[in-house]
Amino acid sequence: MTALNHTPLNAAHRALNARMVDFGGWDMPVNYGSQIEEHAAVRTDAGMFDVSHMCVVDFTGSRVRAFFEHAIANNVGKLKTPGKALYSCLLNPQGGVIDDLIVYYFTEEFFRVVVNAGTADKDIAWFNQLNEQGGYGLTIAPRRDFAIVAVQGPNAREKVWATVPSARAATSELKPFNAAQVAGTPFGDLTIARTGYTGEDGFEVIVPAVHVEVLWNALQQHGVRPCGLGARDTLRLEAGMNLYGQDMDDTVSPLDAGLAWTVDLAAPRDFVGRAALEANGTRAAFVGLILQKENGKAGGVLRAHQKVVTPHGEGEITSGTFSPSMQESIAFARVPAAVQIGDTVQVQIRDKNLPARVVKLPFVRNGKVLAA
């Protein structure tokens, strides 16, 4: 059996008596006692997640912008100011999603990308192939010397500033999806991005791995609650945010995964997968579902791979959970394109067909329930 990978915070999680699980080959905390309380901390105050299993990759060279114009489906032409970030899919020639990622622009010769843990090796091999085929001459460097801590919630930024006072000046004016580099902190040189995966405000902090445990402990002392993968999943689902490998993969078009907004077909770029997207168009709708209650009770919980029956044909739930914020069972589903917001569909749970309402995503954003 292959040994699990450990983040630099593994000992810290175990010291907090975290329940650890195998997450894509990484030994990760699913919770530290109460997933519900961790979820609530992020919605109402501040929680933090170890996301050091994700991989930072640095791209340097004179043609780095041209490389990303070809490599990703979103348009790096939108990246004009240092620190600006862009969410995009990385596509194969068939239009399937190799990964979803965030690209940060710092200079015309330096871009930084954060990719998912389970796809990092595949992504880096693909980047290297595109670099070689296109003769871009870039240096592509995975940075496993970095760790990442996501601090999320309405009070997250204030608690980061209390922990790292020297970061306030550089980050207090940051708009969402922007990052700043903060040098010379007690935790080393940091990259602090106003991004996240919870539907709340906050920062994702890229920190030298050798300093991350000290930062983690300092954040805890300033009232930031450690949170595990369990709360991360319920938070991202409420926030309408896709999970790679579950809501989309190499065989699924972003147009069929609710990610059309991340694909820029307006600019005349020859990006990988464009021809396939234009040929196939949108073949399915990607929607939210809320399980209907009978006599105030839901007859089950919506889960991935349950069948969705509609008058227009069958679909499938890609992600599902019980929402702590809404006290409802919620899901994402890929369904026939004719299904409309407001429709009622049937979900096969065990041996029953139970009604669910089709809603627009997201369910919750900035602590407010949006889907009714």
Swiss-Prot record:
Catalytic reactions on record: N(6)-[(R)-S(8)-aminomethyldihydrolipoyl]-L-lysyl-[protein] + (6S)-5,6,7,8-tetrahydrofolate = N(6)-[(R)-dihydrolipoyl]-L-lysyl-[protein] + (6R)-5,10-methylene-5,6,7,8-tetrahydrofolate + NH4(+)
Record flagged with keyword Transmembrane: no
Q: Note the Pfam families from the entry.
A: GCV_T (PF01571), GCV_T_C (PF08669)
* Origin: domain of life: Bacteria
Q: What is its EC number?
A: 2.1.2.10
Q: Does the keyword Calcium apply?
A: no
Q: Give one GO molecular function term.
A: transaminase activity
**GO biological process terms held by the UniProt record:** glycine decarboxylation via glycine cleavage system
> Any idea which UniProt keywords this protein has?
Aminotransferase, Transferase
Its cellular-component GO annotations read: cytosol; glycine cleavage complex
Q: What does this protein do?
A: The glycine cleavage system catalyzes the degradation of glycine.
Q: Which family does it belong to?
A: Belongs to the GcvT family.
* Assembly description: The glycine cleavage system is composed of four proteins: P, T, L and H.
Q: What is this protein called?
A: Aminomethyltransferase
Q: Which organism is it from?
A: Burkholderia cenocepacia (strain ATCC BAA-245 / DSM 16553 / LMG 16656 / NCTC 13227 / J2315 / CF5610)
* Organism lineage: Bacteria, Pseudomonadati, Pseudomonadota, Betaproteobacteria, Burkholderiales
Gene that codes for this? gcvT
